[in-house]
Amino acid sequence: MSRDSGQALLSIQGLSKVYATLDGPVRALDHVSLDARRGQFVSILGPSGCGKSTLLMIAAGLVPASSGAVIVNGERVARPRTDIGIVFQNPVLLDWRTALDNVMLQAEARKLDRGAAERKARQLLFSVGLEGFENKYPHELSGGMRQRVSICRALVHEPHQLLMDEPFGALDALTRDQIALDLQKLWNDRQMTVLFVTHSLAEAVFLSDRVVVMTPRPGRIDSIIDIDLPRPRTLAVRDTAQFAAYSRQIRDLFLASGVLREG
């Protein structure tokens, strides 16, 4: 079942974003409102160009909104946030630092106690199957391993909220499945709120408590679907009738909006 304390950690209120271009203004987001409650896993699912990543960057305080507000713990976000972890599609590791040292980069930037931070970093690497790879450099790691290092780096300071921008997009199907399982365990153990951008319908249903379905540009919320599947979830849940029903419900929304076309 979904984890929901009833209190919104993150509230996005009437958010719009308009970019100025040589051809005139382009509206990327149009009056988007949603809440992510404490401990929830919320996925944002939609077609390319619908403003999913822009929404995440505004929630992180990295991009200003044209109108509307992002409220975190009752306070309006007006600058880049330091209370979160963030993971991008590309791991962005430093080639000259080992896996452990890349994770520790977050701790160094925040001036955390090195001994305690290193213990956390090693535990995180162990929890995602990278025990024995702590001293390997990025070029010695597979794409999936590098992304695991990136996730560990985002968590070493123990944030209460994790923002993820298509973190599995460049990975093969089997690696995506394994990292999804790893992420589910990390989320469950830490009881953090996750805002997860993805193109994958199956990924969204498997991981989420709520799936926010976006329309094509300008990005609006088409529907918010609560996913009531037992936790912890195994890959076998994808074979159930309930999983298929959620997938069909979302697919029908994309057919109705013209994102998908049949015949």
Identify the meaning behind each predicted range.
Residues 97-105:
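Short coil-to-helix segment of the ABC ATPase nucleotide-binding domain corresponding to the Q-loop/switch region
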Residues 136-139, 157:
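Conserved signature/switch motifs of ABC ATPase nucleotide-binding domains
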Residues 162-165:
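Catalytic Walker B motif of ABC-type/P-loop ATPase nucleotide-binding domains
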Residues 45-47:
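The feature captures the beta-strand-to-loop junction immediately N-terminal to the Walker
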Residues 104, 108, 115-133, 185:
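Conserved ABC ATPase "signature" region
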Residues 60:
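Helix-to-loop junction immediately C-terminal to a conserved catalytic motif
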Residues 68-80:
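Conserved ABC transporter NBD signature motif
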